[in-house]
C-alpha cells in the first residue's frame, strides 16, 4: 500500500454538507439528498482504492498535478463502462429481462414508452456515463396502437349500433392515437426527470430524433408525430415546486437536419420550425447535420452516446454497419495547456513533451481497458445479457466487445485555445496560429491510430466537456506556472477546440472555424453558439440551423432559461460578486440570491446543468460573449 485509508474526512464533510468541492462537482446532483450522498460516499471509497491499489503511481501523480485527468475515478473500482447507444429496438421487438422479470414485446405505444423508461433507469444504474435512445425504435408501436384502437372502435360501434362513415371513423382513431402518443411521450419526459438511479441522479439520457431512420413511409409519418409531440412537450417544460413551467435538464434532445426538413418547402419543415422555437426557449434540441455526418462517417448518420462521445463506423461479419448496442470504455484527458507551458515556447520541446504525455495517456487508457477486461456478463445483465448492448450468455466475459473497434476508448483533450495562444502569442482563430492547432489535433489522431493498429482497441480523440475539472486544471496550472495573461489568468480553461468564450466572433464564423476541428475529433465533439433570448426572432434561429446543416456535423445554441421563485422573474438570472469576491447568482428584479429559491439552467458540458457550478465554471459562464 502506498498510503493508509484517507476517506474519513472527505466522507464526513460531504455528509455534513460542508465540502464545497463535492457540492459543486456535478451540476445535475443535489449533494444534500441522502441518495446522492450515498453515491458520493461510494465514490470516495472507489477513489481511495483506485489511488492506493489499482492505478500506477505515475498516473495518480499526473492526475493530481493536472497534467492529465483520469475521468470517473469514483467508479473505477467497479467493472463499469462509460456510455452507450442502447439497442432499444432489439429489446422492444425481441423482449428483455428487467430485475429477473421477462418483458415481452409490448402491444401498444404507451406500453413501449413505459418499458423504455424502465430500461433507461436500469442502464443508468449499471454505468457511469450517458446513454442514447432513438424515437425511431418506438415508431413501429404507433401502428400497433392504431390497429388496436381501430379494433376497439369497431367493437364499440357494433355494441352501440352506431354507424360512422370511414372518414369520421379514421378521424376518431387518429384523435385517440394522438392522445396515446401524448401520454407515452409524457411518460418518458416525467419518468426521466423524476427517476433516481443508483448514481444519485436522473439518468443522463439523450433522445435521438431522425426521420430517415424510419424503415418505411408510414413509419416515418408516425415518427414525425412522436417527434412533434416530444418538441411540444419540451417547449412547455415541466413544473417546479411552485407549479411554474421551467426548463428540465433531461432528456437531452438531438434533432437531425435532413433534406426534407431543412428547406421551407420540405415536407417536415414544420418540425424544424417547432425545434427552433423549442431551442429558443428550452436550449434543446441540439442539431446533427445528416449531410455533414454522412461525409465524415462513411455515409452513416447515428446518435452520439449521451452528450458527445461518438462511435466510429463498424461492420459486423455480414458487412452491415452497426451502431446500437455499442459503447465507450472510458476517457482520459490530456491538458494541452500544461504541455505548452512545460515547453517554454520551444516548439521542438513541445512536440517531445506532447509525445511523452500521449504515452502517459495511453498507459492510463489501458488501465481503463484492463479494468473492463474479464468482466462477466453477470455484472450487468440488462447490458450484456438482455439486449441493451449484447445478448451474451451467463458467465461469458465481455472481452470480445472490447476489441476490433466494436467499442471505443477516448483520448480527451482540453485547452487547445490557451495552448496555441501561449506558443504563438495569437488566438488559434488567427490564420498564423490555426496551422499549429490543426497539427496538434493531427498528432493526437496519429497516436490513436497507432495504438488502434497495435491493439485493435477503438481509440479516438474526444473534445472533453470539462465541468468541475476546468477549475482544477486552471488552479494546477496557476500553481505550477503562475498567472500568465491570456493563458492562466482565468479560473477555467477552454473545453476541447472551442474558441475562447471571451473572444468576439459571430455565430457563422465560429461554426465554420470549429468545423475543421470537429472533423478531426473522431471520438466526439460538439460546437455551440451563445445567443440572447431569441423567442421573438425565430428566423434568426432558423438561419443558424440552416447554416449548421451545410457546414458542421453537430452543434447547439446556448440561451438562458431561468426563473426566480421569490418574485416570479422569468429571464436571465445574473452572476455577480458578493462582499468576499465570490461569484453568486442574483435575481435582477428582486435581488434574491438564495439558490434554493431559483431555477437556473445553463449548458455547461453538452448537457444542461441545473444544480449550479464551481467558481471556475461559474466564471466561464459569466464571461461568455454572445455570437448573434
Language-model features: locations:
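Flexible, active-site-adjacent loop/turn segments at secondary-structure boundaries
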Residues: 136, 337, 401, 409, ...
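Long insertion/accessory domains within large nucleic-acid-processing enzymes
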Residues: 591-628
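Conserved catalytic cores of very large enzyme subunits
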Residues: 4-405, 426, 430-593, 599
Amino acid at each position: 500500500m502506498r498510503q493508509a485509508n484517507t476517506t474519513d474526512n472527505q466522507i464526513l464533510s460531504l455528509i455534513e454538507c460542508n465540502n464545497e468541492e463535492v457540492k459543486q462537482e456535478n451540476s445535475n446532483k443535489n449533494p444534500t439528498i441522502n441518495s446522492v450522498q450515498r453515491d458520493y460516499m461510494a465514490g470516495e471509497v472507489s477513489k481511495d482504492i483506485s489511488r492506493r491499489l489499482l492505478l500506477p503511481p505515475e498516473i495518480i501523480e499526473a492526475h493530481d498535478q493536472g497534467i492529465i485527468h483520469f475521468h470517473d475515478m469514483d467508479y473505477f473500482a467497479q467493472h463499469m463502462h462509460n456510455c452507450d447507444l442502447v439497442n432499444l429496438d432489439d429489446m422492444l421487438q425481441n423482449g428483455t429481462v428487467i430485475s429477473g422479470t421477462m418483458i415481452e414485446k409490448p402491444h401498444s405505444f404507451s406500453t413501449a414508452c413505459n418499458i423504455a423508461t424502465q430500461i433507461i433507469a436500469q442502464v443508468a444504474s449499471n454505468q457511469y456515463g450517458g446513454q442514447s435512445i432513438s424515437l425511431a425504435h418506438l415508431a413501429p408501436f404507433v401502428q400497433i396502437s392504431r390497429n388496436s384502437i381501430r379494433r376497439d372502435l369497431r367493437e364499440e360501434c357494433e355494441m352501440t349500433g352506431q354507424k360512422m362513415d370511414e372518414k369520421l371513423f379514421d378521424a376518431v382513431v387518429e384523435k385517440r392515437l394522438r392522445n396515446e402518443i401524448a401520454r407515452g411521450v409524457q411518460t418518458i419526459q416525467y419518468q426521466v426527470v423524476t427517476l433516481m438511479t443508483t448514481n444519485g441522479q436522473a439518468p443522463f439520457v439523450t433522445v435521438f430524433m431522425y426521420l430517415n431512420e424510419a424503415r418505411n413511409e408510414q413509419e416515418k409519418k408516425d415518427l414525425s408525430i412522436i417527434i412533434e409531440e416530444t418538441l411540444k412537450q419540451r417547449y412547455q417544460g415541466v413544473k417546479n415546486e411552485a407549479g411554474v413551467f421551467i426548463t428540465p435538464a433531461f432528456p437531452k434532445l438531438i434533432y437531425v437536419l435532413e433534406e426534407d426538413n431543412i428547406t421551407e418547402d420540405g415536407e417536415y419543415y414544420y418540425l424544424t420550425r417547432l425545434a427552433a422555437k423549442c431551442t429558443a426557449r428550452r436550449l434543446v434540441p441540439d442539431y446533427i447535420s445528416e449531410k455533414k455526418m454522412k461525409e465524415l462517417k462513411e455515409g452513416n448518420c447515428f446518435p452520439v452516446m449521451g452528450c458527445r462521445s461518438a462511435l466510429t463506423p463498424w461492420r459486423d461479419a455480414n458487412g452491415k454497419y452497426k451502431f446500437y448496442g455499442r459503447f465507450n470504455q472510458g476517457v482520459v484527458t490530456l491538458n494541452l495547456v500544461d504541455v505548452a507551458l512545460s515547453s517554454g515556447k520551444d516548439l521542438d520541446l513541445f512536440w517531445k513533451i506532447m509525445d511523452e504525455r500521449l504515452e502517459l495517456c495511453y498507459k492510463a487508457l489501458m488501465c481503463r481497458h484492463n479494468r473492463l477486461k474479464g468482466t462477466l456478463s453477470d455484472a450487468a445483465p440488462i447490458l450484456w445479457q438482455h439486449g441493451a448492448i449484447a445478448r451474451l450468455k451467463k458467465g461469458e466475459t465481455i472481452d470480445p466487445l472490447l476489441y476490433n473497434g466494436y467499442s471505443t476508448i477516448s483520448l480527451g483533450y482540453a485547452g487547445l485555445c490557451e495552448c496555441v495562444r501561449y506558443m504563438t502569442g495569437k488566438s488559434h482563430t488567427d490564420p498564423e496560429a490555426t496551422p499549429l492547432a490543426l497539427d496538434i489535433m493531427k498528432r493526437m489522431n496519429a497516436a490513436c491510430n497507432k495504438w488502434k493498429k497495435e491493439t485493435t482497441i477503438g481509440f479516438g480523440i474526444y473534445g472533453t466537456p470539462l465541468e468541475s475539472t476546468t477549475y482544477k486544471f486552471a488552479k494546477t496550472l496557476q500553481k505550477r506556472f503562475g498567472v500568465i495573461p491570456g493563458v492562466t489568468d482565468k479560473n477555467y480553461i477552454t473545453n476541447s477546440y472551442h474558441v475562447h468564450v471571451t473572444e468576439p466572433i459571430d455565430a457563422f464564423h465560429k461554426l465554420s472555424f470549429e468545423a475543421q476541428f470537429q472533423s478531426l475529433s473522431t471520438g466526439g465533439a460538439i460546437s455551440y453558439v451563445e445567443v440572447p433570448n431569441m423567442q421573438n426572432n425565430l428566423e434568426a434561429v432558423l438561419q443558424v440551423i440552416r447554416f449548421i446543416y451545410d457546414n458542421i456535423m453537430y452543434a447547439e445554441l446556448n440561451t438562458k432559461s431561468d426563473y426566480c421563485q421569490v418574485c416570479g422573474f422569468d429571464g436571465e438570472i445574473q452572476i455577480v460578486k458578493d462582499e468576499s469576491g465570490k461569484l453568486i447568482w442574483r435575481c435582477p428584479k428582486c435581488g434574491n440570491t438564495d439558490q434554493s429559491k431559483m431555477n437556473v439552467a445553463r449548458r455547461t458540458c453538452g448537457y444542461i446543468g441545473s444544480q449550479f457550478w464551481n467558481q471556475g465554471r461559474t466564471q466561464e459562464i459569466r464571461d461568455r460573449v454572445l455570437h448573434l
